[in-house]
Each structure stands twice: as C-alpha cells, then as structure tokens.
From Swiss-Prot:
GO cellular component: centriole; centrosome; chromosome; cytoplasm; cytosol; glial cell projection; growth cone; heterochromatin
Organism: Mus musculus
Keyword Ligase: no
Protein name: NAD-dependent protein deacetylase sirtuin-2
UniProt family annotation: Belongs to the sirtuin family. Class I subfamily.
InterPro entries, alphabetized: DHS-like_NAD/FAD-binding_dom, NAD-dep_sirtuin_deacylases, Sirtuin, Sirtuin_cat_small_dom_sf, Sirtuin_class_I, Ssirtuin_cat_dom
Cofactor(s) of this protein: Zn(2+)
Active site per database record: H187 (proton acceptor)
Subcellular location: Nucleus; Cytoplasm; Cytoplasm, Perinuclear region; Perikaryon
Amino acid sequence: MAEPDPSDPLETQAGKVQEAQDSDSDTEGGATGGEAEMDFLRNLFTQTLGLGSQKERLLDELTLEGVTRYMQSERCRKVICLVGAGISTSAGIPDFRSPSTGLYANLEKYHLPYPEAIFEISYFKKHPEPFFALAKELYPGQFKPTICHYFIRLLKEKGLLLRCYTQNIDTLERVAGLEPQDLVEAHGTFYTSHCVNTSCRKEYTMGWMKEKIFSEATPRCEQCQSVVKPDIVFFGENLPSRFFSCMQSDFSKVDLLIIMGTSLQVQPFASLISKAPLATPRLLINKEKTGQTDPFLGMMMGLGGGMDFDSKKAYRDVAWLGDCDQGCLALADLLGWKKELEDLVRREHANIDAQSGSQAPNPSTTISPGKSPPPAKEAARTKEKEEQQ
C-alpha cells in the first residue's frame, strides 16, 4: 500500500482526525471530544469541497422589515431573483403541481401515459401533437405580466438587479421589460425554435411558431420536414449553457437572493439557492415554505445550502407566505416603491391593451386600491396561510 503523502491536505487532515480519536479515547470528556471531531469533519468537508464561508449575520431581524432595511443599506447592491410558475399564476397561467388547478392535474384529455410525458423529449419526437395542443392554450402573448414581473423590472430600474433566473417559459419577463442580458431562462423559451433533426437544426422565429400552433398544424421544418420544437428544455435535455456560465459568475458576488413562486423541486435550478455565499440573505415569497435543509447533510457538512427559517441557528432566511403579487406589494410598500410599482403595472397593462386592441384587463392582476398586506411576521404569515387553506 502506498505511503501517505504529507503534502496531500486530505492525508494531513485524516491524520489529525486519527489523533483526535486517540486523544478522545483517553479522556473522560468523550462527548466533548466527539463534538470537536464532528466540527473538524465539517471543516474538512467544507475545505475539501470549497464550500466554506463566514456565516455573518447581515439582517437585523428575520422579517420582511429586516430584509427591507438591508436592501436600503450600502451592503445590498446586487440582487438575484429566482422565480418559478407561481409568479405567473395570477396572469392565468397554471403552475405544474397544484393538486386541482396545476397543469399536471388537467392533462387527462391528451391521453398521456403519465402527465410528465408531455414534456419528455423522447415522447415528443414520437407524439408531438399533445404538446402543441397544450401550447395553444398556454402560448406567450395571450397573457400580461404580473405585479411580480414588474417588481423585478423595478429592481432593474433601481440598479439593484444582477440577474433574474427563471424556470418559466412564458417570456413574461421579457414582456415586462427585462432585456436578454438580465435573464437566465433556465428551462428555455418560446422566443426561438429549432428543427429537432440534429443534422439540420434550422432556426425559426416566435412569429413562425405562433402561426403554426394557432393553425393547429404540427410545425414541420421547411428543409427536412422534421418536427420543429420551441427552445424550451424538455425532460431528457440539457439546460442552456448560459445557465452554467452565468451561475459561475453571478453567485460569488450576490448580496441578496429573492426566491418567488417556486417549489424548488427541479434540479439543477433548485440547487441555485446553495450557490450564494453563506452570509447572503435569502427571501422566499411563496405560498408555502420550500427548499429547507436536509438535517443530516446540514449536520455532517455544515452546509448553508438549504433554507433554514425556523431553527435556533437561522440567521439569513426569511419566508413571506402568501400570494406572490401581494408579497411583492408588501415589500415595495416597505421600500417606499408601492405607488411607483402600481403606476408601472397600470401603465404597462394599458400599453399592452392598446397594442392588442383589447381594453379588458386580467382581473387577477388588477391592483386592489386597498392597503397591501402587512409585513410578514411569523404570526401574520401563519394566519394568512390558514385563511387561504
């Protein structure tokens, strides 16, 4: 067997672990020694995997008010938003997993072998018709951006938005005024389409695809007659390279994560919450708490990856539970941006109506003239959740 290399940090660390074990066995403080050994193992994991960082507390309290004061300070200059289907439901676009109203719960008419098949690339290549029938119902351009979308735009206008990472394929972030450089469309977009034939890959515009979908004709490549698919990421396909390149550059310098309308169940998007420095505060605006730490991994590796809202060690994670639009209004109110946000939504919706020739607003995105919900202290959040249920 090869001799240990003293220059190898893993060998050195392993030797120290053995020394700690030997020392512990000779003392009456075995419990204390065991704790020291666990601390050492945590350090070993974090150093070896490059996960170590200082757990500095930057929020003076773990509430929406605490997040607001931090956002108004000099420490908060770069905000990343991580968003999912929950920010678009008030525009009339269903999310995926809600038991009765979610997309997966309403696919019986397509006679699929299982709900997820409609977004599997292998099934799509053989049976594209169900996807395009669904796409007609959900096609971008039929919906208006929500208060959440315009709150993200307001972050951009205030010079605070570093990037918006979205799981959504509805392009409403673009409609709301975000530029391509502001976005990472992690699960792709309807903005462009390509032939699925790998030897062809001809590109098509959003307008071309829309015409095909609304004529109820399966889009076929004009060169090779293969199916043309919007550039959204199906199960079994890789995420866009931009997702990984931006992740590497963005998360080392982020000052605040705002996570909205996502179950944080789909990887690798869900793992983004663990990419920020351990001191970076994280605000969740959602109907329920998501993304919590696995207790065993948290103990063994000292990871700050999962969200920790309730333990005694919580120091940076805040949950505002309720409707995402109302959460954005509550935060905007505390920041002194509420009127500006409401005016922006009304003005942009009026412009969309004028361009489409329609004067009927989306009822679910119409702003109530009443006061926005109070900032979410735990008791208020719990009461709000119970009322919704």
